[in-house]
Amino acid sequence: MVGSLFALGVLFLLCFLHPFVTYPASLMVIRLGRGRARIVRASASREESIAVCFCAFNEESVIEAKMRNLLHLRHLAPHLEILVYVDAATDRTADLLRPYADQIKLHISPERRGKTYGMNLLAEMAEASIVVFTDANVMLDSAALSNLYPYFADPDVGCVCGHLTYTNSAESATAATGALYWRLEERIKQLESDTGSVICASGSAFAVRRHLRRPVPDDVSDDLHI
């Protein structure tokens, strides 16, 4: 009985450590064995058009900063499409967005349909060849969109993941823990990219060729499905 409990404990420990220790270690071994996956960053082509999409529910505390951020990006790239889906917010999110209605494609849902539904709808509404999906509380760097062009200049690239930087990691232990976890997650994603085996995108910011995207089932996370 003691032996069985010990074996079960070891198995549980291995399962816990696998995502953080053995899985990254296996990726490093694969990378050493066959080298990095081919990554072509061709000369930047500005022929690709870009749309930025995000869903919002009760985001009144950040929505104005988000819009200032995106309109700044449009100032740098005048043809940037901006699409927003409001998922029946019960705060002032929709009211704060309405003044921007003539500058963006805005859909305000009268009922809760969920983020996946909203992202699917915005992807259908978008006209650009590259669609960037992001979150309402994520601010995009001024160079975020221009950095996409060298990757998508390679026709074999269908999706590009963003790099998330926590700006409030010093505010609390929870924020610091989240930032530490995300740094580990990003390290793993880099190893997956190096070995040509990225499992999922980052929901905070990722870009995909619109013609390659397929509707995401309602019960599946969009960044995992992609």
What is the meaning of each model-derived region?
Residues S142-A176:
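Conserved donor NDP-sugar-binding/catalytic core segment of glycosyltransferases
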Residues V62-A65, T90-P99, A143:
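Acidic helix N-cap motif at the loop->helix transition within catalytic regions
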Residues M1-A44, S193:
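N-terminal membrane-anchoring/stem segments of glycan-assembly enzymes
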Residues E48-A51, E81, H225:
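Cell-envelope/extracellular polymer assembly enzymes that use nucleotide-activated donors
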Residues V131:
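Short aromatic/hydrophobic "clamp" motif used to bind/position activated sugar donors
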Residues L80-L83, A94-M125, A176-G178, W182, ...:
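Conserved donor nucleotide-binding strand/loop of the catalytic core
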Residues A51, N69, Y85-A94, E111-R113, ...:
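A conserved acidic beta->alpha catalytic loop
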